[in-house]
Every structure is written in C-alpha cells, then in structure tokens.
Amino acid sequence: MSDKWSPNSWRNKNALHMPNYQNEDHLNKTLNEISKYPPLVFAGEARLLKKKLGEVSNGNAFLLQGGDCAESFADFHPDNIRDTFKVILQMAVVLTFGASCPIVKVGRIAGQFAKPRSSATEVINDLELESYKGDIINGIDFNQKDRDPNPDRLIQAYNQSASTLNLLRAFSQGGFANLNKIHQWNLNFVKGENAAKFREISSRIDECLSFMEACGINGNSVRQLNETDFFTSHEALLLQYEEALTRIDSTSGKWYDVSAHMLWVGDRTRQLDGAHIEFLRGIENPIGIKVGPSTKTEELLKILDVLNPNNEAGKITLICRMGHEKVSGILPKIIRSVNSAGKNVVWTCDPMHGNAIKSNTGFKTRPLKDIISEIQQFFQIHRSEGTYPGGVHLEMTGQDVTECMGGLQEITDEDLKNRYHTYCDPRLNASQSLELAFLLSDFLKEEKLLSKQSSNL
C-alpha cells in the first residue's frame, strides 16, 4: 500500500457498498458546500477518546458503545435523543459499580445514517429499485424518487448531526447527567415486579451514594458527579461525506475526520486493498474494525499494521460479531493471533449482528437470550485466553419498541408487531438495555474478582 495519503486517495481504490449518484455535478456541489461547514467534533475530543480507550486496552476501563441501527430523518426529535442518552447513562452507572472502573460512553448517534446492504437493488411486483441504504443516501419508501440517491440528503444529515450533538453536549454538561438523578431512574426500573433480582445491586449503589453524600461528595462539590464525557461514532461507509469533513487539526497538523469522534469499518467493507481501509488509514481518530465469521486472521493482522502502524493503545477497537452459535469456535484463534503479534487493541463484543433470526410472524428479530449467551461466551473466552473483555457494542434505543424478543417484558413473537419501528435491524428497548446492563455488571464484577485472585497467586 502506497504511503502517500490524502482525504481523497480512497477514490483510487475499489469502493464497495457505495451509492451511484445520477448527477455528479449536484453531488460535487453539495460536497464542496459541506467541506466549508464547521467541524461537528473537535480533534482534541477525539484525542481524549483515544486516551480513554487506551485505558480500556490496558484493562483499566470498560467501553459502552450503543445507539440506533440507523438514524432516520423522520424520527429526529429531542425526546428520542434524550431517551437514548438517558438509557446509556443508566447502563453506565450500573456497569461502573460492577466493573469498579470508569465506563467510556460512545453513542452510535449524530451520524449513523448509512447502512451497507446485502443486495444493491430490491424487487417488488417486478419493479426493481435501489435498496434502502440509509437516510443520508436515499429514502425508505419504495418509489423511484425516494430510492434514487439524493445528494441533498448529505446536508440534511449534517444538519441533524449538528443539532443532535448540540443537545448531547447540553445534556452531558448541564446537569442532566447528575449521578443521583441517574440512580433514581434505575431505582424506578427495579421497582418493577420482574426486576426484583436487580434490587440488591441497586440498593448497594444507593448505600455508596448515601455515604458519599454524608462525606460532602455530591454534584455541587465534585464536577464529575454532575457531568460526563460522551462521544459519538458511526460507520465510515459513505466516503464522499467523510472526505468532505476531514480536516487538518491546527494544533497538531494531523488529519481528523470531524464528522464523529470514532469511526468504524464494517464487516463488508474492510478489504485490505479497498477504499474504506485506505481512507481510515490516514485519519487520527480512534477506529473500530468489525470482526465476523468471515474474518481471515492473516488479513486482520495486515489491516492492523495499516491502520495502526505505531501500535498505539486506544487507536483500534476490534468489534467482534460472531453469533452465539459461532463465537466459541472462531474468537479464540483470532485472540491468540492478535495477542501473539503484540497488537494493542480494545476487544469488544457486538452481540447483535450475529444473532438475527426471522420470526414465525415474519419479523427480523434478535432473541435477548442469544444476545446474553454471546456476551457470556465472550467473557469466558477472554478469561481462558488471559485477555481483557473491554466492552460491548449494542444496537439499542431509549424508546419502548418491541423488536427484540424476550427480557423482563417477556416480548414474544406475537408482540413484535405492536411497536416494530426500526428502519433497519431490530434494537433493544430501554428495559432490555437496562436488564443487559445489570447482567453485565455481574459479569464484570466476577471478572474483577478472578483477576484479583490470579494476581495474588
């Protein structure tokens, strides 16, 4: 791979899962306009996230990454942003207690608009149109006008991302993230009849907060109890958009993609000689790599060399998405290869993408029991390999949807139709996300206990 890189050098490579725009002049005019827009995030924030992820890779923190499968223009509303942010905060408090370490909070938000599809086109009643590829590219309604890729959508996506980030910054720094307030939300959750098993953890958190308050440690005296750091991420799929938002940082002289703090490359676009790897190798942002059953270990090691030539801690997060039936047969070999090569990475579990099934009623869904099973195996495998399970990557929402089966609400196949609102893949609802956080808290506590015991031997 040539060492010469620029924000547009990806254009010389094979770019998979990219839309074909009919009017190139319209596209170029739009991209030129976006290239003059202010950055959505700042380079210093991306550096801070990389530093925090470095702590994760060293086993001193845990990554919670979650949000929508694909953001939509139609669902853009401050309440939806608030509810997703709220449930991530609630999960983080529970996980902090279990892990006894900081939780790095990263949202799939403020830019997660593009989705790769298995088929470039879709056929209904003998009419063949472009597949829906996310609101930044085309519309979900099955008609020619909606399905044709439209450059104007890039500007709408930028504007929505800017508004979302503005609200997230206000929430994270303006008192909404107060620790006592978040804990009160969790207390309300465990009051539910089916959530009794989580009350012990919640009561112990309550005792800790009461003790801190008695010592004069509260949101008024300690900023960290009233505010939080929250970062954004999305898949770097639509490279024209990413290129337009790639800028030189004035303080370091290095290139950053200012569309998000963290970008990731998907399972379908991580070809070593492809356009997406070419683009990502030149930016300083933290980068995620989706690792699935099709991953060839030798190629993954070469990708790590390309994307992180200095083996920098916090630069690379490997997002493992195997499926609960395959993870035990695939992940150990990958861990051993990466570990023996001495690569600094954050290991996270994406228990969503490998566990989708088609229900008897025809809905694409994900059983919560399968999601939990993959996470459990992920932890067990890392324990066996002597490596650190550094995080989870979830498709979730703060809304009360019925898209994934199971959980305390006991959502069944028949219930899916009630509030199945996703534009793409099924998401955990707020209750299922919190339930998962309480279970994860137990896993993390056990992990810390075993780690302490082994260090004392």
Give residue spans per PLM region.
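Basic/polar N-terminal segments that are highly enriched at the extreme N-terminus
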Residues: 1-4, 450-457
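Short N-terminal secondary-structure initiator segments
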Residues: 2-11, 49-80, 292-305
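Glycine-rich, charged/polar anion/phosphate-binding loops
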Residues: 48-50, 273-276, 303, 332-334
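A general structural signal for short secondary-structure junctions and capping/turn motifs
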Residues: 53-56, 94-96, 279-280, 381-385
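Short loop/turn segments at strand-loop or loop-helix junctions that form parts
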Residues: 64-69, 106-109, 349-352, 395-397
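Active-site-facing alpha/beta catalytic cores
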Residues: 71, 76-323, 366, 374, ...
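Non-transmembrane, aqueous-exposed alpha-helical and coiled segments at domain scale
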Residues: 300-310, 315-347, 353-403, 408
